[in-house]
Amino acid sequence: FLSNAYQNPVAPGSVFKLVTSKEIVEAGIEKEEVEDTGSLKINGQTIRNYGGNAYGSIDFREGFVKSSNVYFMNRALKLGGLRLYKAGKSFLLGENISLDFATIRSNFDLKDYEDNVIATTAFGQGETLVTPLQMAMITQSIANDGEMLKPYLFKSVVNGKGKTTQEGKTEKLVKTMEPDTAEEIKDVMKAAAESYDLSEV
């Protein structure tokens, strides 16, 4: 029996755009506009937005809110495979992460940085495989101003006499980004949630 939450890596899909977003913000190209025609042809392969939607001239904020594959592919190709690879590594992608209850693994290899692999990796497809738990850890690090914390199973253990015998502890795993970068990504995450009337954040 494998737990899908932390033992079964899968293609992360658009949630991986959080990783690409880090590099977009850190490179200072978030104000640049991309012409989104609904698809992008790379090495003879046409890759489309979900539903084939075209969004016209969009910057980082609108590209994130619309979840534009074309925008993120374009930005990843501008940044280059090495930067995208380093972004993934900053979130411990491709590493074995030892937790109290399991070791979580992911597959993250840009395979010599071919353009089609770079482009599809940018929006969570390609060869990338990640567990839902690790994607939650990536999201948590953004919410926590760039500090990724180690998950633990329990807050405390209390015996029959009401005495606490063991406590879970917060432990920092890695710094993934600067607080200013995290704040900018949090801002577009809020905008995305509110644009779909999912919540008011």
Q: What is the predicted function of each stretch?
A:
Residues F1-S14, V19-V201:
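Beta-lactam-recognizing serine transpeptidase/beta-lactamase-like catalytic domain environment
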